């Protein structure tokens, strides 16, 4: 250092040297004489050594000191080259005799000087910080006062610092000896002696300082307590004071290090002057906000101070809440950094608050509130808070995953960022063997795979990574991961999941893992067998995003490297206002125009005015489309927004009453009501099963506002016409929905007039709709009340399509349809109509003919008779051509009569004249029964001409006798008495196989004669007579059936032989299985030993007992009897079914209809066309 530099710095450092010497040079001691003489001789050598000691002490300090302070400390001591700068004068040494015991040695003075220099340096730094803010001035003042208070503790540690300085001085001397090559032995000895003298002198003075009981210094109490304290305690106290001293200025140090403008001020000396700071900011230097210099010129000094506080690392956290609010209220410029930092802090608080409130029921509401705020700007904070919340509460992982799925469907970059951070977190935890972090992160990734946010490849990569190195922790993490997303992976890629389970099976068979982990693997296999029923991929209440609307990210473990942690920090935005406006427009498109509502409801009053564009506006836009060259958006974004808002409210509300109140707040226009009703119906149809919530909601809405009734009616009519466009699940949900509306009278029953149930218009989809619709109504109302409702006069016209009365074919179809769905009781009136319908046509024609005949005059009787005969002949010819059912029945009667005559030869041979007379009587009865159908001419001829009557009677008798005789002769020729028994047996077996034929064959002789006579006269009978004869014959068949049953029972009793029954019972008693177990075992043991059997007969004699076995012949006989019975039953059913022309399914329906509704039946099968009239 040059002398000029030292002289230039002398006046600047006068006050510091005076202040430092004021506390230390207050007295003198006796040990100073030897030091004087020593300094006179070897001043330069000693001071150069002291200079090195001081430099080492300064460099080893825990805090840093600038170069100026170091030079000031070393000014008194010369360098090694021997230049004596600022040496202490002899006069000053001689005059100052009143040194105290503590200030006799120069190293001690130097330590105090270093502390004082340190304090002065800190004060300079505090003065620099004082220019920034008043709060920094206060903190600097407090730290300065603390430093002055704690400087007293430096005197306590003097002894310890002296010892340190001695040891360092010795080391420096040795170093100088090694480096000095040119000096001889004398120089080394002088140095050694100097060091010894120095050590001795210092030890002497330390001892003398301890021996003194009283000192002249200001700090007596601290010196008195010195001997009682250990050096370790003193060191800890010093460290504590240093910590307290540094705590006050931590924030300022960080700000000095990290803020670029403040670094610039440190370099530039111009900023050290407090008066020129405001002027420089106006010029554009140190512009913290990064805005234009003109805007910064308008900022006041107070605003600048608040800006420095808010843009610091703490963000104003060290201020009181009132002061922070005042500062925030003063800032109104949105382009400033202070305003942006305040807005960012508010956004962070909102995000943390909403995420902490999430649960299963409130996911939709909270995501909607999150989307209102600018989450694109705060995406880093959002991802960080979600990951942190999931780590603290892993039980809500599926809820957070559902929320991320909703956000990812609208902002895929946020979902990708969160997934990347989770993957990086998992990789770091896997590398550090952190099991807890691995479990939480893998759990979250599994649920994101379930929600289709992450691809399945990522899950498979994680599983393979964990199972490749099978430790206890890795296998446990893999098991928990598989439990959560196993169902989804088996659905998507079952083969790869099967390979992973095979690897787990091999690990289990090796047996190297812990027993607990082995048991977990077994449990996992059991869960897989059960189909993951306790670990579903997605709960129904959290399935909020459709599969087509979701964006799936394909990430790999190796590709993800950078988590983008910079997004968590504040960053100034030059275009803050424009970006915020863009996001508001985007949120309106996503959430609808009610995104600004704070309560999450659907708006009310003025807010609902911007819900959708009015119909008039839309029309004007369409009209002006071709006139103006502007592009019109016809994608209907407002309509999509309305659908989204309604869907979110339906999923967020707890009950239908709350939902109805929220939906009614929208105050929709008339053109929007149809769309609103359609959205409700679509939401109901999309459910897996019908939910009563939608029916109750629509009923409440229709009662609150009756303008919604007409749109629902129109929708019902449209659905009835377009049922073929819907699948079965939607049809069932919609039909049950409208059934609920009709039951609650939310809409009128006049809607049913659009349904027409005919064979021509019948479609399977429409039949399914009507079936589920009517079955749901019957469940609500009951069959009795429902039938009563349908029979009211008001609904007579509306139900004409469902219950037609114009055509028998349509009547029959409606009856068959409702009976097939289990609602045949509704169609009683139609059944009665169907009975009357075929009889109405012939009866009217006959009545007209009768009236015409009665009105004719008596003179034209002959002509009318001839004309009537011709008419009858023509009618008979037409009947034969058309093959009426009456003629078929007559033919069957002929066939039946022939069979019965052949079966009863004996009775036919033994006929007497009495039988002939009885046949005449029967003929007369049949004629009397058919009087109504015979014409008036035939009746008059029979009544008023007895001769003709007798002649006709005799002729009829003769003809019948001749016929019977001819038939009897033929039967006697063909049939011998020897073959009678065999043929009768065959006939009995045939009768068993075909009981329907038997019932027709078993008729009395009187019936046979009457049937023959009716055949001869059937040409002259009408349909009404044949129907009456059928009714009479039906009654006779019932009596014949009861008679045949009795005969069968009697014959069965005769067939059974009593002796055979006794034999069978005896054999059963003697069988092996009825013998007691004890006797059986005893007999077997005796036979093994060779002894005779122990069984005895009735007289007490022993005899060998043979084990009886069942005879094969008896077993065969029973089997054959069982087969016969079974064959007879089946044959009778098949015969009846084949005769009726029904399939097997419809035969069962036929029997049911005969039991419940014995009126009509029509087969619905495509193959068979059969109509049955009872």
From Swiss-Prot:
Compositional bias segments (type: Polar residues): 36-47, 93-102
GO cellular component term of the entry, any: catalytic step 2 spliceosome
Keywords: Differentiation, mRNA processing, mRNA splicing, Nucleus, Sexual differentiation
Note: The M.domestica genome only codes for one male determiner Mdmd protein, which is encoded in the M region, and can be located at different loci on the genome (chromosomes II, III, V or Y). The M region contains a cluster of tandemly repeated Mdmd copies with only one intact copy: other copies are degenerate with large truncations and frameshifts and are assumed to be non-functional. The presence of multiple copies in the M region may preserve its integrity in a hostile non-recombining environment. This protein is encoded on chromosome III.
Domain of life: Eukaryota
Any single biological process term in GO: mRNA splicing, via spliceosome
Residue span of region Disordered: 1-51, 80-109, 136-259, 840-1045, 1096-1133
GO MF terms held by the record: RNA binding
Composition bias, Low complexity: 16-35, 138-153, 840-857, 926-957, 1010-1020
PANTHER family tied to this protein: CELL CYCLE CONTROL PROTEIN CWF22-RELATED (PTHR18034), PRE-MRNA-SPLICING FACTOR CWC22 HOMOLOG (PTHR18034:SF3)
Domain MI stretches: 641-757
Organism: Musca domestica
Compartments it resides in: Nucleus speckle
Gene: Mdmd
Primary localisation category: nucleus
Listed name of the protein: Male determiner protein Mdmd(III)
SUPFAM superfamilies: ARM repeat (SSF48371)
Phenotype of gene-disrupted mutants: Complete sex reversal to fertile females because flies exclusively express the female splice variants of transformer (tra) and doublesex (dsx).
């Amino acid at each position: 250092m040059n002398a000029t530099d030292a002289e230039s710095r002398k006046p600047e450092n006068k006050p510091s040297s005076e202040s430092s010497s004021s506390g230390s040079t207050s007295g003198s001691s006796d040990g100073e004489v030897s030091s004087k003489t020593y300094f006179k001789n070897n001043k330069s050598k000693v001071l150069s050594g002291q200079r090195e000691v001081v430099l080492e002490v300064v460099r080893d300090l825990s805090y840093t000191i600038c170069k100026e302070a170091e030079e000031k400390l070393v000014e008194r001591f010369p360098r090694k080259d021997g230049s004596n700068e600022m040496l202490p004068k002899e006069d000053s040494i001689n005059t100052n005799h009143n040194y105290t015991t503590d200030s006799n040695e120069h190293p001690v003075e130097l330590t105090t000087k270093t502390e004082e220099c340190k304090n002065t340096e800190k004060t300079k730094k505090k003065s620099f910080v004082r220019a920034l803010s008043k709060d920094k001035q206060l903190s600097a003042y407090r730290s300065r006062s603390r430093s002055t208070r704690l400087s007293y503790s430096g005197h306590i540690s003097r002894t310890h610092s002296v010892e340190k300085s001695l040891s360092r001085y010795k080391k420096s001397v040795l170093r100088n000896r090694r480096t000095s090559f040119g000096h001889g032995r004398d120089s080394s000895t002088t140095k050694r002696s100097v060091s010894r003298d120095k050590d001795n002198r210092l030890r002497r003075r330390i001892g003398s300082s301890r021996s003194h009981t009283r000192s002249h210094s200001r700090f007596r109490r601290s010196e008195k307590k010195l001997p009682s304290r250990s050096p370790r305690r003193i060191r800890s106290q010093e460290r504590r004071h240093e910590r307290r001293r540094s705590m006050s200025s931590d924030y300022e140090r960080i700000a000095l290090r990290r803020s670029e403008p403040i670094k610039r001020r440190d370099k530039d000396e111009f900023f050290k002057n407090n008066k020129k700071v405001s002027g420089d900011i106006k010029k554009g230097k140190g512009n913290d906000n990064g805005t234009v210099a003109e805007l910064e010129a308008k900022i006041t000094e107070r605003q600048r101070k608040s800006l420095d506080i808010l843009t610091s690392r703490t963000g104003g956290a060290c201020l009181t809440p009132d002061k922070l609010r005042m500062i925030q209220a003063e800032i109104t410029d949105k382009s400033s950094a202070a305003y942006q930092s305040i807005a960012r802090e508010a956004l962070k608080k909102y995000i943390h608050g909403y995420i902490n409130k999430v649960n299963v029921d409130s996911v939709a509401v909270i995501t909607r509130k999150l989307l209102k705020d600018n989450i694109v700007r705060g995406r880093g904070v959002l991802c960080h808070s979600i990951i942190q919340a999931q780590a603290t509460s892993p039980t809500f992982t599926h809820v957070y995953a559902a929320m991320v799925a909703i956000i990812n469907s609208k902002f895929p970059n946020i979902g990708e960022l969160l997934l990347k951070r989770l993957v990086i977190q998992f990789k770091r935890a896997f590398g550090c063997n952190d099991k807890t972090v691995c479990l939480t992160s893998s759990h979250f990734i599994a649920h994101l795979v379930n929600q289709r946010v992450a691809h399945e490849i990522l899950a498979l990569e994680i599983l393979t990574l964990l199972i490749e190195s099978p430790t206890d922790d890795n296998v446990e993490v893999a098991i928990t991961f598989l439990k959560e997303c196993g169902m989804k992976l088996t659905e998507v890629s079952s083969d790869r999941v099967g390979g992973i389970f095979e690897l787990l099976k091999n690990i289990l068979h090796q047996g190297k893992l812990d027993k607990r982990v082995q048991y977990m693997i077994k449990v996992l296999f059991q869960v897989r067998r059960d189909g993951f029923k306790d670990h579903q991929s997605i709960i129904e209440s959290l399935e909020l995003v459709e599969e087509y609307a979701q964006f799936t990210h394909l990430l790999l473990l190796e590709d993800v490297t950078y988590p983008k942690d910079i997004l968590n920090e504040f960053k100034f935005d030059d275009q803050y206002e424009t970006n915020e406006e863009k996001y508001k427009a985007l949120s309106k498109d996503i959430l609808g125009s009610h995104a600004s509502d704070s309560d999450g409801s659907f708006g009310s009053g003025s807010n609902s005015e911007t819900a959708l564009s009015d119909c008039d506006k839309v029309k004007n836009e369409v009209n002006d489309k071709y006139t103006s060259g502007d592009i019109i958006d016809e994608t209907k974004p407002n309509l999509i927004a309305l659908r989204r808002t309604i869907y979110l409210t339906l999923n967020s509300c707890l009950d239908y009453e709350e939902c109805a109140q929220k939906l009614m707040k929208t105050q929709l226009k008339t053109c929007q009501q149809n769309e609103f009703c359609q959205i409700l119906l679509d939401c109901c149809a999309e459910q897996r099963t019908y939910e009563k919530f939608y029916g109750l909601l629509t009923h409440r809405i229709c009662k609150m506002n009756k303008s919604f009734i007409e749109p629902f009616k129109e929708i019902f009519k449209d659905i009835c016409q377009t049922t073929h466009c819907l699948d079965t699940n939607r049809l069932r949900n919609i039909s049950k929905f409208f059934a609920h509306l009709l039951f609650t009278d939310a809409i009128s029953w006049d809607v049913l007039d659009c349904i027409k149930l005919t064979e021509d218009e019948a479609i399977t989809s429409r039949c399914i709709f009507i079936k589920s619709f009517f079955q749901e109504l019957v469940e609500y109302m009951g069959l009795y009340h429902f039938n009563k409702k349908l029979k009211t006069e008001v609904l007579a016209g509306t139900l004409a399509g469902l219950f037609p009365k114009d055509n028998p074919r349509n009547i029959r179809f409606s009856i068959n349809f409702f009976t097939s769905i289990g609602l045949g009781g509704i169609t009683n009136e139609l059944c009665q109509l169907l009975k009357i319908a075929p009889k109405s046509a012939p009866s009217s024609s006959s009545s007209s003919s009768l009236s015409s005949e009665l009105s004719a005059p008596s003179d034209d009787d002959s002509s009318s008779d001839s004309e009537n005969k011709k008419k009858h002949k023509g009618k008979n010819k037409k009947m034969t051509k058309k093959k009426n059912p009456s003629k078929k029945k007559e033919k069957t009667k002929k066939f039946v009569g022939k069979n019965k005559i052949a079966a009863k030869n004996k009775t036919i041979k033994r006929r007497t004249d009495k039988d002939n007379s009885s046949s005449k009587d029967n003929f007369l009865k049949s004629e009397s029964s058919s009087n109504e159908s015979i014409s008036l001419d035939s009746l008059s001829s029979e009544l008023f001409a007895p001769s003709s009557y007798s002649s006709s009677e005799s002729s009829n008798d003769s003809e019948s006798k001749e016929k019977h005789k001819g038939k009897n002769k033929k039967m006697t020729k063909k049939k011998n008495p020897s073959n009678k028994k065999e043929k009768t047996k065959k006939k009995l077996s045939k009768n068993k196989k075909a009981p329907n034929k038997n019932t027709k064959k078993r008729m009395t002789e009187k019936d046979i004669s009457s049937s023959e006579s009716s055949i001869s006269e059937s040409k002259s009978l009408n349909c009404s007579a044949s129907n009456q004869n059928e009714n009479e014959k039906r009654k006779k068949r019932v009596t014949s059936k009861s008679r045949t049953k009795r005969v069968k029972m009697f014959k069965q009793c005769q067939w059974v032989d009593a002796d055979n029954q006794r034999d069978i019972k005896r054999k059963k008693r003697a069988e092996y299985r009825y013998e007691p177990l004890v006797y059986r075992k005893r007999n077997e043991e005796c036979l093994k030993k060779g002894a005779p059997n122990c069984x005895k007969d009735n007289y007490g004699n022993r005899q060998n007992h043979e084990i009886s076995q069942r005879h094969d012949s008896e077993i065969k006989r029973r089997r054959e009897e069982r087969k016969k019975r079974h064959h007879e039953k089946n044959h009778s059913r098949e015969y009846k079914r084949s005769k009726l022309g029904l399939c097997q399914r419809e035969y069962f329906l036929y029997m049911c209809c005969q039991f419940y509704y014995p009126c009509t039946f029509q087969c619905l099968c495509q193959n068979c066309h059969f109509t049955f009239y009872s």
